[in-house]
Amino acid sequence: MRMNSRQKGGRPELGGYHAPAESGRIAAPDAGESNPAEGPYTMGRHFMRRKGAVYVPVGVHYVPRSGPDWPWRVDEAEFDAAFARMAASGLTSARIDLLWAAVEPERGGMDEDHLAVVDRIFDAARSHGVSLHPTLFVGGEVGDAYWDLPWASGVNPHADPGLIEAQARHAAALARRWRGREELIAWDLTDEPPFWIHCATTTDADARRWTDAVTTALRENDPGHLVTIGTASQEVDGGPFRADVVADRLDFACVHPYPIYSPELYPDRLLSRRMTHSAAFETALARGTGRPVMVHEFGASSAQFAPEAVADYDRLMCWSSFGAGAVGFYAWCWIDAEPGAYRRAPYVRMPHETQFGLVDADSRPRPRAAVLTGLAHAMQDLDLDGLAGDGPWCPASIPVPYEYSRPYDRASYGLDDAPAGPYVPSEAAWEPERDVKPLVRGWLNSYVLASRAGLPAQFPREGLDDAWPATPVALLPAPLTSTTSSLLHMRTSFWQGALDYAERGGVIYLSCSAETAIPELASFAGVEIVDRAPVEGDVRLMLTGAVGGMDPGQTLTVAGTEAAARAGAATDLHLRGVQLRAADAQVLAVTSRGAPALTLARRGKGAVIVCAYPIELLAAEVPDGLGDDDPVWAIYRLVRDTAGVRPAVDLDSSLLTRGILTGEAGGILVATNHSAGDLTLPLRADAEVNGLRVRIVDSAAEERPGAAAPQAAATAGDDVHLPRGGAAIVTWKRAAAHGGGRRS
């Protein structure tokens, strides 16, 4: 199931950035009743657990090859055969759709014959050792399909009080029926809400009320099973079901990264660096709400991309998101549509939807099937509890504005402490359809650049206390530094804490656009904005100091300025830089006109780095941008070097993305090769680290039947060969308490 990104549509009370200072981890809100104390599956401190042991589901969504409207076409036998093949492939879980119109064809009247079929589908899953993940109320599914209700046609089920009550009763009945099922891994409230046909009429408040009603009904009648929602594009589209709105009612959140449907964010080829970071990016963004996150759907059509390219894409997506903290994986989907289904909706209208299978319509495996098999074997082979049970190590924070989490919240206006006038923000009239995409472009490209620099980042939410991150690095790319649209920037009072953060040892990075406005900039950054920068088609920064491995005298070309000029940088101030004047900041690069372009100001134990150009938003304008030869990542490496941050174990290359997971016994380095070629790199490790072992995951390793890719013992300094599109999984143990990284 995929939602076209062109369709638009309370949060957990985390306060500010209250993570432990040592790790910078985002603390989860109190799960309360949402985490079942009894039951076959529970949530641990990071991973899901099955009967006490870490369990990472690696599975697939099953749609019968005859089409998504399966209740009218097939019975349990089709599911049984598919589950048998999944189990033989090493997959451990299957997600299925329960179509509302089939389960409840009349208001309040359940179809007992159909439910008996679903009973037998549960039995089939159990018999093959496959956990089952049922999705309720499926309405939107595959292409443009919306399976309507015959007794409530055209009514928005997320907003209509009567339909919300009906769904609560429906969920309660199913919970009572299947609460004893140990093969049921978790309830999925529905697939990709808001239902596509009702995107424009569903609000944040609707999403919250609907989620409250259905989760309450499930938990009152089945307190022993986990609950989630299979959301797609909600974080990157600013949709009403984004994790900030609903995640505190769930046991884990979900993302369905489909960058192929978001050219406004990913104007790229399938194996481009941005594309293959989409799952890790969305995982990290949703994790900022304090809930674990599953990569709950992903894939690409073999009708549009070569099957071997799709396999490389899946491998990079899965392993990089695992390094970013993902706790489960469900591919879309198990099998292609059969040719006889091509004449029927939705396939007759959406031909690409026929070819997403791990296997073709005749059950012949495609290369991506081996990727999932290898992932499943590795998840069972790794000591995830001891080496990764604490989740990802993230030394950098990219903040999420409060307005994104809770738009137009009266508490954010600062008028409740004393008598004040009846303030109403005119911004709601100026911009009734708020565009979140400039913010997401800034986040996304900042995340990719930080990944290239070996600086794993998290996305903590801004609070009303103006607290700064607990991490040693704060990355604030444009438009977070801007003004005018409150959706896109930090609160004005947030900047009052910048100097204190830096003086206590934090390193701040800012990129500026012609929209930037920070009252305290001169005091904490040692520079001031003089004017808007000239609009130029080609901006080259001449280095006057060392920057991320580049020497003084070298030139750093800012990609995207020519594209931005064509796109109208003269009128879109987010794509235009600023002219800076340095006070006490060191100038590390200048423009062709001699103006400061990159500066560094020392403040107490920390520092502030300012870039005069919105390099992240400019990179977003370049198709297939942030490629192997793009040098802008060096600015982020300057940030890392200035902070003195480094992981405990590393394969140090800007062509790799490295995620670090830690546990009580050691850690795991997940290095994914997003470059255009094979790499051979020396393994670096801190002195406290021992027991190094290396596993290479690529197409050759995945072809070995019946087992995980082999591990080999290693020592610091050993060369590690990592093929293009592959992943290196390096595990280590430690003799004493030692986190995922350190500051020198």
Feature annotation, model-predicted:
Residues M3-I96, A102, L651-G663, T672-G677, ...:
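Mature N-terminal, pre-catalytic/accessory segment of carbohydrate-active enzymes
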Residues E38-V245:
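Active-site mouth of glycoside hydrolases
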Residues Q167, W334-P395, Y408-R410:
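Aromatic-rich peripheral "rim/lid" segments of glycoside hydrolase catalytic domains that contact
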Residues P194-A200, E264-Y266, A279-D314, H352-A361, ...:
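Active-site clefts of carbohydrate-active enzymes
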Residues L226-G230, E235-A303, D336:
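Glycoside hydrolase catalytic-domain groove-lining segments
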Residues F298, Q304, A311-V348:
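Substrate-binding cleft of secreted/luminal carbohydrate-active enzymes
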Residues A369-A470:
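Aromatic-Pro/Gly-enriched surface loop or interdomain linker
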Residues S482-R743:
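A conserved amphipathic helix/loop scaffold
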